[in-house]
């Protein structure tokens, strides 16, 4: 069994048919003792623009007013609070919260009108100070993925910037992220146009386009940013020194991109819903980040790969199951399994175990790992059941199944405010 003597804590948000449920779990000791606290209020905020849930601080809920940008602490979270997803800047004490805009236009009409949606940057502060709203920045429309670029040992001249992709615009906003550069700090200094006119029916060369970027990471091995354009089935190789697209690599059929811990391999996940109207075919592919060759491809019947992340050492890859499609295809899906792969010798990818967990009859099932080298725990939510599976990362067995809600839900999120966990 894994050594779980170190302390751990989780903050979870589960959407139960429009009502948000917020719970905090903490535990320690070899007997995996844990405590659960429910922070959900029975009533809504009563506001036109519901507050944003940012995280927990000293046992209180951190809420951001989207109109005034004021941040306050509360004993409870209103049931209509918006659980904004976020990206932690690894080089500062700041978190970037994303707003995808409304479902139809992708615009944050409160802050940007019809000109895009937003990224909100918050300074966490210390134990004795309130978090501070730094800036709300209008970027492009639709879902965002943020990638932080900064100098590293292998590439010490890289600029300090953040790449924010915009799904519905087909672009990447380059945001200055160097506090010593006051002219460019937290300003959009460049916009990368991801349009490929050969992939557009009308010969479009501008923004918006049909690139639909989703999945983007910086490799410290190559010093390049790899951006997956779902609409085109391409991976763009971008030089962060110039913000220019150097190469476009075919990678069709994959919906997300993940880099190996060594930065030398690109792992794509996707699903084929067209070949067989009764069965979904899940796919995992490994591309060499320097030769751009697909060096491994795995296909799993009746499986939709939802979230995937490496453990702390990079020797295991955990892939969660979830639901997609409709009719017979959806009925045949395996939505109760966690797939665990040996990645200690990439590009080899060997299945260690398909582990039975609870159900996820929804499109996304995240995963979390304690940010502690002494802990080997893995946490996988089961949204449909309203439970959380605690997994021993050494033996890859379920230690416990924890009830976190009275009923099931359709969307689950971990909060990464506390830095106590990492994942997806």
Predicted features, each with a name:
Residues 1-424:
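Predominantly soluble domains enriched in secretory-pathway, periplasmic, or organellar proteins
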């Amino acid at each position: 069994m894994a050594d779980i003597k170190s302390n751990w804590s989780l903050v979870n948000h589960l959407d139960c048919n429009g009502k948000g449920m917020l719970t905090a779990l903490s535990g320690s000791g070899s007997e995996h003792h844990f405590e659960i606290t429910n922070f959900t209020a029975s009533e809504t905020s009563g506001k036109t623009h519901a507050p944003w849930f940012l995280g927990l601080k000293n046992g209180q809920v951190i809420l951001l007013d989207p109109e005034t940008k004021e941040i306050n602490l509360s004993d409870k979270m209103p049931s209509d609070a918006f659980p904004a997803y976020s990206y932690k800047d690894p080089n500062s004490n700041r978190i970037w919260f994303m707003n995808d805009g409304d479902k139809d236009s992708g615009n944050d009409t409160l802050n940007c009108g019809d000109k895009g949606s937003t990224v909100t940057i918050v300074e966490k502060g210390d134990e004795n100070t309130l978090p501070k709203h730094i800036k709300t920045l209008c970027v492009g429309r639709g879902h965002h993925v943020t990638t932080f670029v900064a100098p590293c040992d292998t590439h010490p001249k890289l600029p300090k910037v953040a790449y924010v992709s915009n799904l519905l615009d087909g672009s990447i906003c380059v945001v200055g992220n160097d506090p010593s550069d006051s002219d460019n700090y937290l300003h959009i200094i460049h916009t990368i146009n991801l349009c490929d006119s050969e992939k557009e029916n009308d010969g479009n060369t501008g923004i918006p386009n049909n690139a639909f970027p989703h999945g983007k990471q910086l490799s410290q091995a190559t010093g390049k940013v790899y951006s997956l354009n779902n609409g085109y089935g391409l991976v763009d190789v971008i030089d962060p020194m110039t913000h220019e697209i150097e190469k476009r690599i075919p990678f069709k059929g994959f919906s997300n991109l993940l880099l190996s811990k060594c930065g030398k391999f690109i792992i794509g996940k996707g699903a084929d819903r067209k070949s067989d109207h009764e069965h979904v075919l899940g796919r995992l592919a490994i591309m060499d980040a320097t030769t751009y060759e697909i060096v491994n491809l795995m296909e799993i019947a009746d499986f939709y790969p939802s979230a995937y992340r490496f453990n702390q050492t990079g020797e295991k890859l955990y892939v969660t199951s979830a639901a997609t499609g409709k009719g017979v295809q959806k009925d045949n899906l395996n939505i109760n399994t966690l797939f665990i792969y040996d990645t200690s010798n990439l590009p080899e990818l060997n299945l260690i175990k398909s582990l039975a967990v609870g159900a996820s009859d929804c499109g996304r099932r995240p995963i979390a790992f304690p940010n502690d080298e002494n802990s080997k725990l893995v946490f996988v939510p089961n949204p449909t059941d309203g439970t959380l599976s605690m997994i021993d990362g050494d033996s890859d067995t379920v230690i416990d199944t924890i009830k976190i809600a009275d009923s099931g839900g359709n969307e689950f999120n971990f909060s990464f405010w506390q830095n106590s966990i990492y994942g997806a």
